[in-house]
């Protein structure tokens, strides 16, 4: 099974080291922002995972989501929206140009049954949750709670979730197996938790969005 870190944000001078470290951790692919694409995609050789360009936007209204999706379409491989209001969350879940909805401690309401039902009606979609807060502050109850809520709700509602490191430097990367173990610790079955870094799940989203 191919494994992907759905969000890596290396500084220009760190690109090679971050990507090679990701490869050593077992990732076959990583997703990077467009501004890192020129530098990172020029790297070749053994140990460099496949690269996806990820678009990311924070949106408060339907109009924000629509405009961002139209602007990013064709420039990136997939689009992630962090909704700042319930209106934006519902529209992002229905918009066929938006692949993934990002959820953290500030918008846990977006990972609800309503979002899941809209994605089910559309036929595809996923959530994304970052491990970065735990990386920077592993003792934070809020960071643990946010992760637990997203993982448990997504499992209960049947919505796929991607774990993202948001790593800027090599030491901020998580092994996919460590991420799965963390999810299992929070109550997700191990076999399901291993899918949180599945590149195949991303490909399914990309194929569905083109259909």
Swiss-Prot record:
**What GO biological process terms does the UniProt entry carry, in alphabetical order?**
tRNA 5'-leader removal
Q: What class of enzyme is it?
A: hydrolase
Q: What is its EC number?
A: 3.1.26.5
| UniProt xrefs under InterPro entries | Pol/histidinol_Pase-like (IPR016195), RNase_P_comp-3_arc (IPR023539), RNase_P_p30 (IPR002738)
**Subcellular localization, as worded in the UniProt entry:** Cytoplasm
Which reaction does this chain catalyze? Endonucleolytic cleavage of RNA, removing 5'-extranucleotides from tRNA precursor
- Keyword annotations: Cytoplasm, Endonuclease, Hydrolase, Nuclease, tRNA processing
Record-stated family: Belongs to the eukaryotic/archaeal RNase P protein component 3 family.
Q: How does it assemble?
A: Consists of a catalytic RNA component and at least 4-5 protein subunits.
Name the chain's protein.
Answer: Ribonuclease P protein component 3
The species this protein was found in: Aeropyrum pernix (strain ATCC 700893 / DSM 11879 / JCM 9820 / NBRC 100138 / K1)
């Amino acid at each position: 099974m191919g494994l992907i870190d759905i969000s890596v944000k290396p500084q220009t001078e760190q690109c090679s080291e971050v990507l090679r470290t990701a490869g050593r951790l077992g990732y076959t692919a990583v997703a990077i922002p467009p501004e890192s694409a020129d530098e990172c995609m020029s790297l070749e050789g053994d140990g460099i995972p496949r690269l996806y360009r990820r678009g990311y936007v924070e949106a408060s209204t339907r109009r924000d989501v629509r405009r961002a999706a139209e602007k990013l379409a064709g420039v990136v491989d997939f689009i992630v929206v962090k909704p700042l209001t319930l209106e934006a969350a519902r529209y992002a879940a229905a918009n066929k140009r938006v692949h993934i909805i990002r959820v953290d401690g500030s918008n846990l309401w977006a990972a609800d049954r309503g979002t899941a039902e809209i994605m089910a009606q559309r036929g595809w979609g996923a959530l994304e949750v970052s491990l970065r807060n735990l990386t920077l502050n592993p003792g934070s109850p809020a960071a643990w709670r946010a992760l637990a809520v997203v993982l448990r709700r997504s499992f209960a509602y049947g919505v796929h979730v991607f774990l993202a490191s948001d790593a800027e430097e090599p030491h901020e990367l998580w092994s996919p197996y460590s991420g799965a173990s963390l999810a299992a610790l929070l109550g997700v079955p191990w076999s399901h938790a291993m899918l949180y870094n599945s590149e195949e799940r991303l490909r399914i989203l990309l194929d569905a969005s083109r259909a």
